[in-house]
Amino acid sequence: MASLIYRQLLTNSYTVELSDEIQEIGSTKTQDVTVNPGPFAQTNYAPVNWGPGETNDSTTVEPVLDGPYQPTTFNPPVSYWMLLAPTNAGVVVEGTNNTNRWLATILIEPNVQQVERTYTLFGQQVQVTVSNDSQTKWKFVDLSKQTQDGNYSQHGSLLSTPKLYGVMKHGGKIYTYNGETPNATTGYYSTTNFDTVNMTAYCDFYIIPLAQEAKCTEYINNGLPPIQNTRNIVPVSIVSRNIVYTRAQPNQDIVVSKTSLWKEMQYNRDIVIRFKFANSIIKSGGLGYKWSEVSFKPANYQYTYTRDGEEVTAHTTCSVNGINDFNYNGGSLPTDFVISKYEVIKENSFVYIDYWDDSQAFRNMVNVRSLAADLNSVMCTGGDYSFALPVGNYPVMTGGAVSLHSAGVTLSTQFTDFVSLNSLRFRFRLSVEEPPFSILRTRVSGLYGLPAARPNNSQEYYEIAGRFSLISLVPSNDDYQTPIINSVTVRQDLERQLGELRDEFNNLSQQIAMSQLIDLALLPLDMFSMFSGIKSTIDAAKSMATNVMKRFKKSSLANSVSTLTNSLSDAASSISRSASVRSVSSTASAWTEVSNITSDINVTTSSISTQTSTISRRLRLKEMATQTDGMNFDDISAAVLKTKIDKSTQLNTNTLPEIVTEASEKFIPNRAYRVKDDEVLEASTDGKYFAYKVETFEEIPFDVQKFADLVTDSPVISAIIDFKTLKNLNDNYGISRQQALNLLRSDPRVLREFINQDNPIIRNRIESLIMQCRL
């Protein structure tokens, strides 16, 4: 159980974003596809064919929908559809070969009776009679003439719901769409010198290859995909299609597009990834024959290597997912060898390696697209680990091997002891290899996978070579640097302190008798179980208890409003009173009847275990569950106190009372306070004041002078259940005046009744307070 609590406390010290990886695992088959960006823009439209990055061949993969592009005049490539997306009525597009074909398209809104309108076509004002009898659909009309001074005639109208239109140069003709959606078809106009026809688009447009004409027709009839209709899709200049690519180098920084403030930079990098596994081998308390777990842990590794003559400093974090749990039980006797859980990674597991280096590619990694990578495979083999028993031959876990194969790359954040870094997460799928692993001198043999006992074998690190490519949006001025999204300091000293505490506990447990081992097992989180077998520590314990009592006599706890029950002894239920406004800074106890502690200690008690259990009855840390389902409300302050103890390498007579007082004063960071009379006046945490009637919970005008008098003459109460929660409770369930008054003063018995009834309103309020206290 102690190990469970250690793990729960450690869980609160780390934040891991795995949702994207979990959703992707096993959902697609990974294939290596060679990709060279061709002369087109890639603007956040899916699907995208990912590949290993830039390689030295001529293969080109085109997107189905290239764009959107900004309105412009240019010579469209032959055999490519221009998919136009106008937003308003008027001229949509015009084009001419300046010889025998002038062609323009106009858009007419629904429900337009025959009317004469003026349009500007090829720089001239033209009067055109138009109409649209449809009540819901927009109408595209082609206007065509064959001489510069000729009159325009109307052709090939298209009635459209999605308001999209297409035009293409192909085979000596200009193709357009006509008919009515969702059954529109293509038509064409013959022209000479069709390849020299310049087009002027007056709206955003896309470019679709002729090979995808069926998809273009689908868009014309049914509209663009939802992703293209969001504010996140921004049109770019048509010049972004003209990208010059050079042969790959170990370091490449290529300007993809550039505006006055921002530019897109493509970074291509050859990289060397070095990583190692970390593990945690935890020995259970007892005589030394049992291990509670052998597990994987995230491992940080920092190194340098040379890339294109430049020394690069890199940092990797290796973690695993999809772990398989095994166990071995040699028997029920205290001297039987037992491993409660040992972890193994196999073909259903994944390895994540977060990579960061000090190159320019990682300095502005905020907005990234077109991310791809190609990495080699690597084999990881297990070494030998001996389980040191007090007596007898040591069991040895040996062997095991897996190979890692690249399965994708995403953005990530990796945490070091000092800072978090925006990095690339390379995901690897696993396949099992020879040899299998076994535990010598046990019946465990012939199992495949890599166990956590010694995953690095005798190697300092494993190494993978590869290459990645990405396009990042960065400031045009290189002197500006965008901030890293996550820039926080990360502390991992809690784990080290817990490890020291665990070792001390295990060493102690092996020195005392079996009867006291049983007592320790019954009190796994009792702070005195650390030293319950050593008689000399009892005096220190009594001194601590005495100091606790003295310390609390000096604090504001002496004037407690209500008594605490055993079930809520460690929760924030002892509400303090005070005679001044300064008492609003508060007081609620995390302990029960502290003043009675010393009276329960009998100096003449002959048994060490009796003395320890006597103290333990008053100073007991209850188990703190980290999940909200079935959450134990008995101990809000346990985690606070436990952390303080864990961070202390030594406990002296002054440590415990200081911790207790601090926990009692500060374990709820955000509180509301109220003053009680015939009216109830509440001061919220942002300094705003409200007044309510107790019977009806109706808000009444706030009397500042009366509030000042009440603060001076009546008790100020720290609110566990605020008025918003009370009013919600009264509106939905109905509560009596006495229940309201009991809740106003946070009576622990009434709180417990509502909690036992699984009342969601009270439960949610207390859960929110507990969330404020998360470590």
Curated annotation (Swiss-Prot):
GO cellular component: host cell endoplasmic reticulum-Golgi intermediate compartment; host cell plasma membrane; host cell rough endoplasmic reticulum; host cytoskeleton; membrane; viral outer capsid
Short motif DGE motif, span: 308-310
Marked site (Cleavage) residue numbers: 231-232, 241-242, 247-248
Motif (KID motif): 644-646
Spike head, as annotated region: 65-224
Gene Ontology BP term (one): permeabilization of host organelle membrane involved in viral entry into host cell
Record keywords: Capsid protein, Coiled coil, Disulfide bond, Hemagglutinin, Host cell membrane, Host cytoplasm, Host cytoskeleton, Host endoplasmic reticulum, Host membrane, Host-virus interaction, Membrane, Outer capsid protein, Viral attachment to host cell, Viral penetration into host cytoplasm, Viral penetration via permeabilization of host membrane, Virion, Virus entry into host cell
Cross-referenced Pfam families: Rota_VP4_MID, VP4_haemagglut, VP4_helical
Region feature (Hydrophobic): 389-409
Site feature Binding to sialic acid, where: 101, 190
Keyword Disulfide bond belongs to the record: yes
Coiled-coil ranges (or none): 484-518
Spans annotated as Spike body and stalk (antigen domain): 248-479
Region (Spike foot): 510-775
InterPro entries given in the database record: ConA-like_dom_sf, Rota_A_VP4, Rota_VP4_MID, Rota_VP4_MID_sf, VP4_concanavalin-like, VP4_helical
Motif (YGL motif): 448-450
Disulfide bonds: 203-216, 318-380
Family (UniProt): Belongs to the rotavirus VP4 family.
Misc. comment: In group A rotaviruses, VP4 defines the P serotype.
Record protein name field: Outer capsid protein VP4
Species this chain originates from: Rotavirus A (strain RVA/Cow/United States/NCDV-Lincoln/1969/G6P6[1]) (RV-A)
